[in-house]
């Protein structure tokens, strides 16, 4: 009996040790604001003839003005020898209606499992951000804030991709990222320039290339200086074959102090249809700064400009936008914020045919510029709580 008791105690102790090496964290963001925007039209669709409609001023409640509302689980297990397993399950939701974002996915923001090894890096499998998105996120003055950041124009509507293998390694001041998607799981509606829907789930028998995607990035950060270079390619289904959407970008930042940082970058873009014909070619630029006025008050200012060289064979006006975000910290977890932006030759977040109106379709709030208008102004006040 004594030996049996000792064995039982040893088993319990070993189980406690094993459990102590694992952890799971519940986290999330609840973000809500009230917004005013002018010159807003309906999202163009094939059924309305790709017509944004007449001008209207809009007063509305939005979910995710500074950070997308979300909830998630993440965990790791120490496997010994510097090896660990990990997972992330994260959904996005509309706080104003309680509905899911990302086309109703249960875990639409991120869903992956992987392994990480000290000195080698991490490899993960599932729905993940692209290498281009990861690389540029640290060089956005507003940190890709949901409301007025033209993230789709900058990084592509495919900045999250299904069925993805992704590697990330940290080597001193250098970070390397690379990914491959067997099928992005992204579908965009037909537009005035393309009569068929764009994209799909991928993994099509006999058509390996359709809806695949890949990319890579390298970043360097040392002291006040940060630089990055990245590439992304998406091969979406267009009709019965696949097109090619390419993006390459560079970004840089410099911190003058703990309270002030400037950053900017350039992104080259080229989209071709299934026949190899050019449907879009643009050069996108951004510059901005962040300034911590007091321990509680922070500011972020950003300017975006898109040199639209070709859009479905025509010369389109070059859109630009200036935006300002001010946040006031009430605690480590709760903030108040004011955001405003003015866009010219496009809707806010530079929404237009050049983005396939993907922002408006995904968010459910139109920023399509109404007929006969050339600018749009938006102002929003909100609260963000992190848990």
Label each residue range with its predicted role.
Residues 1-20:
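Gram-negative bacterial Sec-dependent N-terminal signal peptides
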Residues 21-37, 46, 54-185, 219-223, ...:
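Outer membrane beta-barrel
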Residues 24-32, 81, 85-89, 123, ...:
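Transmembrane beta-strands of outer-membrane beta-barrel proteins
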Residues 38-58, 99-101, 183-212, 234-245, ...:
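Solvent-exposed loop segments that connect transmembrane elements
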Residues 57-69, 106-109, 159-163, 170, ...:
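Residues that define the transmembrane beta-barrel architecture of outer-membrane proteins
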Residues 72-74, 112-115, 166-168, 217-219, ...:
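Outer-membrane beta-barrel architecture
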Residues 204-329, 340-342:
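Detector for outer-membrane/organellar transmembrane beta-barrel domains
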Residues 328-330, 371-387:
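Outer-membrane beta-barrel "beta-signal"
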């Amino acid at each position: 009996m004594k030996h049996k008791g000792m064995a039982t105690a040893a088993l319990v102790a070993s189980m406690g040790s094993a459990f102590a090496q694992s952890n799971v964290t519940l986290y999330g963001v609840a973000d809500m604001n009230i917004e005013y925007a002018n010159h807003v039209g309906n999202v163009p669709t094939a059924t309305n003839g790709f017509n944004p409609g007449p001008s209207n001023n809009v007063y509305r409640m939005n979910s995710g003005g500074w950070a997308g509302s979300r909830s998630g689980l993440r965990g790791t297990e120490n496997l010994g020898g510097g090896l660990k397993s990990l997972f992330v399950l994260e959904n996005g939701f509309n706080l104003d209606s309680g509905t899911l974002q990302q086309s109703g996915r249960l875990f639409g923001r991120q869903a992956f499992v992987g392994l990480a090894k000290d000195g080698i890096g991490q490899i993960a499998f599932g729905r993940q951000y692209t290498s281009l998105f990861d690389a540029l996120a640290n060089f956005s003055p507003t940190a890709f804030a949901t409301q007025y950041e033209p993230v789709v124009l900058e990084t592509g509507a495919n900045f999250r991709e299904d069925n993805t293998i992704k590697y990330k390694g940290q080597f001193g001041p250098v970070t390397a990222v690379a990914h491959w998607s067997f099928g992005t799981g992204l579908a965009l509606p037909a537009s005035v320039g393309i009569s068929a829907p764009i994209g799909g789930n991928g993994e099509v028998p006999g058509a390996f290339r359709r809806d695949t995607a890949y990319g890579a990035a390298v970043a360097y950060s040392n002291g006040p200086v940060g630089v990055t270079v990245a590439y992304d390619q998406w091969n979406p289904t267009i009709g019965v074959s696949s097109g090619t959407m390419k993006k390459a970008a560079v970004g840089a930042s410099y911190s003058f102090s703990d309270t002030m940082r400037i950053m900017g970058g350039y992104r080259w873009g080229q989209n071709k249809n299934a026949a190899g014909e050019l449907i879009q070619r643009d050069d996108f630029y951004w510059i901005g700064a962040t300034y911590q006025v007091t321990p509680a008050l922070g500011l972020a200012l950003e300017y975006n400009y898109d040199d639209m060289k070709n859009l479905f064979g025509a010369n389109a006006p070059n859109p630009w936008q200036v935006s300002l975000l001010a946040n006031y910290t009430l605690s480590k977890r709760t903030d108040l914020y004011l955001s405003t932006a003015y866009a010219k030759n496009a809707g806010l977040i530079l929404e237009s045919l050049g983005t396939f109106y993907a922002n408006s379709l995904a968010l459910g709030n139109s920023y399509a510029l109404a007929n006969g208008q050339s600018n749009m102004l938006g102002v929003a006040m909100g609260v963000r709580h992190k848990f």
